[in-house]
Regions:
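Residues lining hydrophobic/aromatic ligand-binding pockets adjacent to catalytic sites
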Residues: 1-256
């Protein structure tokens, strides 16, 4: 990992009516993605979890965003929640075909497992092998049951180059394993899931972690899912600011 990594920071989703005035300044919904793309470096698409999007929708999102902007998409819940990773290949191929419209702007596919899904190494291995059919992008998996937090799972993910999603929330534990040159973080709200803001001290701590991963040559994706009351966009902007400040301070020390 000789090169420095890249950071992509944003929110989980952007179509929140509660943000219309305070964050979007009253702009119409059709302008919200462009607005986010002018302020964040990446965004996580949450809508894909609930409903498969058309290839035309993905193509439109690609056109509406600048060249260096990146998307992470949350894979549809059919495979992760309904099928619990059983018979994964057909669902993976379907997801791959729909998301192709994003082209090179698709950076990561997130696979979120439900909280009641306990560790099943056989299914995980089958799923990980099936993901080789989608080598053109990176993949991360979010475990919400602690039975998955063990060395055998981490080794499987390392073998197949799948990242652990470090998922911070009040309602389930965080697993901070790092298994690839990608670190994927979801910040759901530490005190109250989906509804609490991150304090400045917490954001500074995440900024320090991100800076360390970047120095190690890892790409870092951080998406805020504490969308209530507009916490997510404010926290994302603050984390971007903190990372930029750390970069300036590091450059100044090198000059001195």
């Amino acid at each position: 990992m000789g090169r420095g990594g890249r950071a992509f920071i944003g929110t989980s989703g952007w179509r929140y009516d509660a943000w219309r005035e305070d964050f979007y300044g009253g702009r119409p919904a059709g302008e919200w993605l462009r607005f986010c793309a002018g302020r964040f470096t990446g965004i996580e698409v949450d809508a894909t979890f609930y409903r498969l999007q058309s290839p035309q929708t993905f193509q439109r999102w690609r056109r509406e965003t600048p060249p260096d902007f990146r998307f992470a998409i949350k894979a549809n819940r059919f495979l992760t929640h309904n099928r619990k990773l059983r018979e994964p290949l057909a669902a993976i191929r379907l997801e791959r075909g729909r998301a192709a419209g994003l082209g090179a702007k698709l950076a990561v596919v997130l696979w979120q497992l439900p909280r009641n899904f306990r560790c099943n190494l056989e299914r995980l291995e089958s799923f990980a092998r099936a993901l080789h059919a989608w080598r053109s992008t990176r993949h991360a998996i979010e475990f919400r049951h602690p039975s998955w937090f063990m060395d055998e799972v981490a080794e499987c993910l390392r073998t197949h180059r799948i990242a652990v999603c470090q998922s911070d929330a009040a309602d389930w534990p965080l697993w901070d394993a790092v298994t690839t040159d990608l670190v994927y973080v979801r910040l759901h709200g530490h005190a109250v899931t989906y509804a609490s803001a991150y304090a400045q001290s917490q954001l500074r701590a995440w900024a320090r972690k991100a800076r360390r991963w970047l120095r190690e040559g890892r790409d870092v994706h951080v998406y805020f899912d504490n969308d209530a009351w507009g916490h997510a966009p404010r926290n994302a902007l603050r984390l971007i600011e903190l990372l930029q400040r750390q970069s300036r301070e590091q450059a100044r020390r090198l000059r001195d």
